[in-house]
A protein has these predicted regions:
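Conserved ABC ATPase signature
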Residues: 120-124, 128
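ABC ATPase nucleotide-binding domains
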Residues: 217-252
């Protein structure tokens, strides 16, 4: 498996079930260990990192099931649990030069959890749980964020909110690798998309080009409009192309 992702890039991986996408991500996240070969992060073999070095300030992992990260009775307590409680003291879990309250408030604002802090995590909607799980991961300030099916079980409203959050993270230099069957989400928010097949990424391109030139892995918008607007891969692309065509017709 060979994969090159630029710093601050949102890279999506699509592919059929059973091709090895989630397995590859679990290896990168050190949830599993390879039978053969080695994995290097920033030139260092992944097995030589301590858990603190790997997961605190370097690698963030978002599982398919966000509930697997919830361990407290309120959203607020769950957030502070990540950074070793509310006490302002240095620890391996929180070596950051920022007051914990300020860090939590910043992440709450980014992930739009205001108004949910006193609720039980299991009482939240699917989209709210996804944002809470992301907030817990982001409190550890990862440079690289791994996401497995981030839009699973959430509606279009929360997909848009999640996409906007990922773009903000990308703008701040966080590198994002996500595995997804949601081709519409990938087309809308990923900078590049790669196709995973038989244990490898066999092709990767800028997302709009990837989906516009693909007959199998493409969006519903592209399938319906490709005879008229072959480069349109999202609903927004189609609407923009139609408006442009109408303007050209009027000007003629």
């Amino acid at each position: 498996l060979s994969l090159d992702i630029k710093k601050g890039e949102i890279f999506a991986v699509v592919g059929g079930n059973g091709t090895g996408k989630s397995t590859a991500m679990s290896l990168i996240a050190r949830i599993r260990f390879p039978y053969r070969g080695k994995i290097y992060l920033e030139g260092k073999e992944i097995g030589k990192y301590s858990d603190d070095d790997l997961y605190h300030g370097f690698l963030g992992v978002m599982p398919q099931n966000p509930q697997s990260l919830f361990v407290k009775k309120t959203v607020r307590e769950d957030l502070y649990e990540v950074i070793d409680g509310k006490r302002e003291r240095k620890s391996e879990a929180y070596p950051i030069e920022m007051k914990k309250k300020d860090a939590v408030e910043g992440i709450v604002s980014l992930t739009r959890l205001e108004g949910l802090l006193d609720r039980h995590p299991y009482d939240l909607s699917g989209g709210e749980q996804q944002r809470l799980a992301l907030a817990k991961v982001l409190l550890l300030r990862p440079k690289i964020l791994l996401m497995d099916e981030p839009t699973k079980g959430i509606d279009n409203h929360y997909k848009k909110e999640l996409g906007e959050i990922l773009r903000k993270l990308s703008e701040h230099g966080v590198t994002i690798l996500m595995i997804s069957h949601d081709v519409e989400f990938c087309a809308q928010y990923a900078d590049r998309t790669g196709l995973f097949f038989q244990g490898n990424v066999v092709t990767s391109e800028e997302s709009k080009k990837f989906f516009a030139g693909n007959n199998f892995y493409t969006t519903a918008a592209n399938r319906m409009a490709r005879n008229y607007f072959p480069n349109a891969v999202t609903v927004e692309d189609v609407v923009k192309a139609i408006n442009q065509t109408e303007e050209e017709a009027v000007s003629c």
